[in-house]
Regions:
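Conserved micro-motifs of the catalytic ATP-binding
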Residues: 22-27, 66-71
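Short conserved segments within the C-terminal catalytic ATPase subdomain
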Residues: 48-60
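Acidic ATP/Mg2+-coordinating residue in the GHKL
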Residues: 114
């Protein structure tokens, strides 16, 4: 039997997807530190017992600087968790995952990249056009693919941001997220 905590988390995650699919805005917008939220998301993955085939590196583009925005902390951590776990899921032989955060042109920036197998060019085009992502069931009949990235795009849109997908050099995937910064509320 599935532990109750797991069931609650799964049901809660479904609610997030449903809320966003029906264009309802997240209700918990608050002043938050983007650097700290990103660091927490990376720490949560590392503390969940990450397999030794994977390495996650966290970097601040402007070290020691906090970046504030109005956002839903839980949704933004979920977005980063989905991106990191997407790299893990699609690179079963392991990879190095880099999460870099900072400010660029008045926006909070986050770049999640890996040196894994990358993504097919046609799928990359579909993602960047913002077309509806169809989920596919993996050969193991358990893992659905596509829902994590769909949720990422919905969370970014709900925060009035942009997301782009590109090949990482020399191979792998790079996801670039830009969210509007907000002044610190006093």
């Amino acid at each position: 039997p599935m532990p109750m905590k797991c069931c609650i988390k799964t049901a809660s995650g479904f609610g997030v997807t449903t809320k966003l699919e029906y264009a309802l805005q997240p209700v918990h917008f608050q002043d938050m530190d983007w650097v700290e939220t990103s660091r927490q998301a990376v720490s949560e993955v590392l503390n969940s017992g990450l397999d030794s085939r994977y390495e996650i590196v966290f970097a601040e583009m402007q070290p020691g600087r906090s970046l504030h925005l109005l956002g839903d902390d839980g949704l933004l951590r979920r977005m980063l968790d989905n991106l990191i776990r997407n790299s893990i899921t699609h690179n079963p032989h392991g990879c190095r995952i880099s999460v870099s955060v900072g400010e660029e042109k008045g926006h909070c920036l986050c770049i999640v990249s890996d040196d894994g197998i990358g993504i097919e060019p046609e799928r990359l085009k579909v993602l960047n056009r913002g077309d509806d992502i169809t989920s596919t069931q993996g050969s193991d009949e358990k893992n659905e693919h596509g829902l994590g990235l769909k949720l990422v795009m919905q969370i970014v849109k709900a925060h009035r941001g942009t997301v782009s997908f590109s090949d990482s050099t020399p191979h792998g995937l790079e996801v670039r997220i830009s969210l509007p910064t907000q002044p610190l509320i006093s």
